[in-house]
Amino acid sequence: MERLNKKVQPVVRLEHARKAFGGNRVLNDISLSVMPGEVVAIIGPSGGGKSTLLRCMTLLERLDGGGLWYGGFPAGEDGELAVARPAGGEPGGKAVYGDKGVLAQARQRFGLVFQNFNLFPHMSVMRNIMDAPLVVQKRDRAEVERQARALVQKMGLAGCEDKVPCQLSGGQQQRASIARALAMNPQVLYFDEPTSALDPELTGEVLKVLKQLAAEDTTMIVVTHEMAFARDVADRVVFMDGGVIVEEGAAEQVMDAPVHERTREFLSRFSG
């Protein structure tokens, strides 16, 4: 925990979030704040709401109720950008979203790495990395290219610059996806089960990259089934089940001495 930046303002803050699909309540009164430099691992059984939580925080889905704020902005209350506010200021009230400009600002503050890579299949590794900084951020091409080449080296992809995704291994594709997300200089990186589509050997490649990013104080929120990663790399672990946060706390506490019976039951399935 010594790594954590002691700034008061969270990078992202979610309050009393609610989300349902039809009659199925997927998120039920979820509140979560993540500080600069913090690594948060979200664990739990399939169908517990983990991926929906990430999709709502990254604006791929809209909350039904509650609020979502991103920090680090020059305007707004306490330097936060209100992406969604609860109607009437009531906790858990209907989520009222900002306009397109607000959502566009928020999207530039985070990167998202999917479990299935989601690289553009017709683009080379370099073009995949450079596309969003050039098109969305309108940055200088020479600067973007320098950054992309540095990220290729950092991700261990030297020699793959001109390859398209089908010419890469799964681990290489996921590392290219991480490089693409980093190219936008995000304040926080989201990972949705980044190793679930990989075999064990390639999983190790990607986890090594995540450990490196954590050591560099990269703010990360990681939905994962990799319990060793949650224990050894995360600062905080959140255990979700049934659309609620059952338990959260320091990684070593939740993983090695969980308080709730449901957490203990879940983790026992991963013990040797």
Region spans (language model):
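A short, compositionally biased domain-edge/stem linker segment
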Residues: 1-4
